[in-house]
Amino acid sequence: MAINSKVVAQVAHLARLKVDPQDSNALSDRLNDILAMVDQLQQADVDGVAPMAHPLDVTQPLRDDVVTEPNIRDKALAIAPAVENGCFLVPRVIE
């Protein structure tokens, strides 16, 4: 699928982005290059390769789970403008 300046304008509209018409051709060229690289990756033979999350089979050392900061919930709730049942009350923003 080739991307032209019309497709760039449609996608920019859907994404609520402003794209200058003079930049549209350069942007479509770059997007076509990206799609060509993706197509090249899709042509790679991966038969017999197990799915993996990371190319290296190593595990990260984990630090001990130690409390490093005090719980200041009560102090924060004490200065909140409105609290109910231990929770902050905020104005409704969605009807």
UniProtKB/Swiss-Prot annotation:
<dbReference type="GO" id="GO:0005524">
    <property type="term" value="F:ATP binding"/>
</dbReference>
<keyword id="KW-0436">Ligase</keyword>
<dbReference type="GO" id="GO:0006412">
    <property type="term" value="P:translation"/>
</dbReference>
<keyword id="KW-0067">ATP-binding</keyword>
<dbReference type="Pfam" id="PF02686">
    <property type="entry name" value="GatC"/>
</dbReference>
<keyword id="KW-0547">Nucleotide-binding</keyword>
<dbReference type="GO" id="GO:0070681">
    <property type="term" value="P:glutaminyl-tRNAGln biosynthesis via transamidation"/>
</dbReference>
<keyword id="KW-0648">Protein biosynthesis</keyword>
<comment type="function">
    <text>Allows the formation of correctly charged Asn-tRNA(Asn) or Gln-tRNA(Gln) through the transamidation of misacylated Asp-tRNA(Asn) or Glu-tRNA(Gln) in organisms which lack either or both of asparaginyl-tRNA or glutaminyl-tRNA synthetases. The reaction takes place in the presence of glutamine and ATP through an activated phospho-Asp-tRNA(Asn) or phospho-Glu-tRNA(Gln).</text>
</comment>
<dbReference type="GO" id="GO:0050567">
    <property type="term" value="F:glutaminyl-tRNA synthase (glutamine-hydrolyzing) activity"/>
</dbReference>
<dbReference type="GO" id="GO:0050566">
    <property type="term" value="F:asparaginyl-tRNA synthase (glutamine-hydrolyzing) activity"/>
</dbReference>
<comment type="subunit">
    <text>Heterotrimer of A, B and C subunits.</text>
</comment>
<dbReference type="InterPro" id="IPR003837">
    <property type="entry name" value="GatC"/>
</dbReference>
<dbReference type="GO" id="GO:0006450">
    <property type="term" value="P:regulation of translational fidelity"/>
</dbReference>
<dbReference type="InterPro" id="IPR036113">
    <property type="entry name" value="Asp/Glu-ADT_sf_sub_c"/>
</dbReference>
<protein>
    <recommendedName>
        <fullName>Aspartyl/glutamyl-tRNA(Asn/Gln) amidotransferase subunit C</fullName>
        <ecNumber>6.3.5.-</ecNumber>
    </recommendedName>
</protein>
<comment type="similarity">
    <text>Belongs to the GatC family.</text>
</comment>
